[in-house]
C-alpha cells in the first residue's frame, strides 16, 4: 500500500508511569495500566496559563506559555499515574495536609507547581549554567569568542545526550521510554490515515517531529545562536543574561517545532533530523499491552474515526480496518 502523507491532528501527549497522557485542546486523558492489569482512564480539562488572553496567541510569546503548560500538566499527569503504585496503606502526611491548607484544598496542584519550578531551576542549572562554566575552562588558551560560544553549545548538547543515555539504564525509565514510543506510534498511526488498532499502532513509527525531545534539541540549537551575541566580560552578567534569555529561546524553539509539525518539505526534514535521531534514545519499541494503554488515552479525548473521515475522506468500517492491518510497517 502506498505511504500516505502525514496530516496534522492537533493531539499531543507524553509518557507517564506505566501509561500515557494525551491532550486534545482543553481536554486531556491519563491512561494507566494498574498493578492488577486493568487500564484506568482519567479525563480532565486543563485550560492553561493565561487562558482566554490574546497574548497566548501571539507568535513567540505563545511558546513560553505552552512550554510552562506542558511542564505543569506533565507533572500533574505523572503524579496521578504514580498514585497507583504507592503503598496501599500510605496515609496522608503532615506535609500533604499543609499543602492542602495553603492551597485551599488544591494541594496536588500546588505540589505540581512547586515540582515544576524546581525542575526548571535544575534544568537551567545543568544544561545552561554548567556548560558555560565548563567551557570557561578553555578561556585561558582560546581567545576567540565565537569559538567559545560553539564550544559551550557542544558541551551543552553533550551533557544532554549523556543525561538521556545515563537514565535509560534504569528499568523504570526504559519502560517510560517504551510508553513514549507507544504515544508517538498512536499519533503517527492517526496522522498517516490508519485506523487506531493495536496492529496498526505497532507498525507505525515511534519517532515524531513534534516530540518534546526535538523541542529540547531546538532549545539547545537556538541557545547557541543567541548566546553567541552575549558580548560581556563579567561572569555574573553572562550567567544572568543566559537565564533571562531562556524564555526567548523557548519561544523561538516552539515556533520552529510548530512549523515542523505542520510542514513536510526537505528543509524541515533536515532541520528535524537531529531531534529525530535523539528520539531513538528517548523512545523504545513498546509491546502490545502498552499500545492498548496509549490507544485508550487517545480515544478518551479524540474522535479518530471522525478525523479520518474529515481529513482523508473515508469512513472506517471493519473490512477497511482488516485491509489496513496488512499495511507495511513504517521505518
PLM regions with names:
Residues 1-86:
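Divalent-cation
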Residues 2-10, 15-16, 51-57, 97-112, ...:
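Cytosolic juxtamembrane amphipathic/interface segments immediately preceding
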Residues 2-12, 16, 20-22, 142, ...:
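Polar-ligand-bearing catalytic/cofactor-coordination segments
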Residues 46-47, 51-54, 64-67, 71-92, ...:
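Multi-pass alpha-helical transmembrane bundle typical of ion/small-solute transporters
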Residues 80, 84, 119-144, 219-250, ...:
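Juxtamembrane "helix exit" motif at the C-terminal ends of alpha-helical transmembrane segments
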Residues 86-108, 112, 125-148:
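Hydrophobic transmembrane alpha-helix segments characteristic of membrane transport
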Residues 108, 112, 116, 148-156, ...:
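Residue-level signature of transmembrane alpha-helical entry/exit and packing/kink sites
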Residues 111-127, 208-219:
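Select subsegments of transmembrane alpha-helices in polytopic membrane proteins
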Amino acid at each position: 500500500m502506498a505511504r500516505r502523507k502525514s496530516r496534522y491532528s492537533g493531539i499531543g501527549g507524553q509518557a507517564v508511569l506505566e501509561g500515557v497522557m494525551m491532550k486534545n485542546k482543553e481536554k486531556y486523558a491519563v491512561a494507566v495500566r494498574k498493578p492488577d492489569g486493568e487500564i484506568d482512564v482519567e479525563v480532565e480539562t486543563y485550560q492553561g496559563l493565561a487562558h482566554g488572553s490574546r497574548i497566548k496567541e501571539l507568535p513567540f510569546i505563545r511558546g513560553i506559555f505552552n512550554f510552562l503548560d506542558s511542564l505543569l500538566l506533565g507533572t500533574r499527569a505523572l503524579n496521578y499515574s504514580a498514585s497507583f503504585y504507592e503503598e496501599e496503606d500510605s496515609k496522608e502526611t503532615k506535609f500533604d495536609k499543609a499543602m492542602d491548607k495553603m492551597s485551599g484544598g488544591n494541594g496536588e496542584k500546588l505540589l505540581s507547581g512547586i515540582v515544576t519550578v524546581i525542575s526548571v531551576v535544575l534544568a537551567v542549572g545543568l544544561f545552561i549554567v554548567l556548560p558555560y562554566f565548563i567551557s570557561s575552562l578553555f578561556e585561558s588558551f582560546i581567545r576567540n569568542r565565537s569559538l567559545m560560544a560553539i564550544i559551550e553549545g557542544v558541551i551543552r548538547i553533550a551533557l544532554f545526550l549523556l543525561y538521556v543515555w545515563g537514565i535509560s539504564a534504569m528499568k523504570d525509565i526504559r519502560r517510560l521510554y517504551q510508553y513514549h514510543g507507544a504515544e508517538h506510534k498512536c499519533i503517527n498511526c492517526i496522522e498517516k490515515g490508519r485506523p487506531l488498532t493495536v496492529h496498526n499502532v505497532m507498525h507505525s513509527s515511534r519517532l515524531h517531529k513534534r516530540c518534546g525531545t526535538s523541542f529540547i534539541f531546538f532549545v539547545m540549537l537556538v541557545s547557541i545562536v543567541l548566546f553567541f551575541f552575549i558580548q560581556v566580560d563579567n561572569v555574573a552578567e553572562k550567567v544572568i543574561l543566559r537565564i533571562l534569555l531562556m524564555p526567548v529561546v523557548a519561544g523561538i524553539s516552539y515556533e520552529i517545532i510548530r512549523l515542523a509539525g505542520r510542514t513536510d518539505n526537505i528543509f524541515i526534514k533536515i532541520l528535524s533530523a537531529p531531534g529525530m535521531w535523539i528520539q531513538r534514545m528517548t523512545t523504545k519499541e513498546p509491546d502490545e499491552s502498552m499500545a492498548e494503554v496509549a490507544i485508550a488515552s487517545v480515544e478518551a479525548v479524540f474522535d479518530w474515526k471522525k478525523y479520518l473521515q474529515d481529513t482523508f475522506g473515508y469512513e472506517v468500517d471493519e473490512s477497511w480496518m482488516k485491509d489496513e492491518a496488512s499495511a507495511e510497517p513504517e521505518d
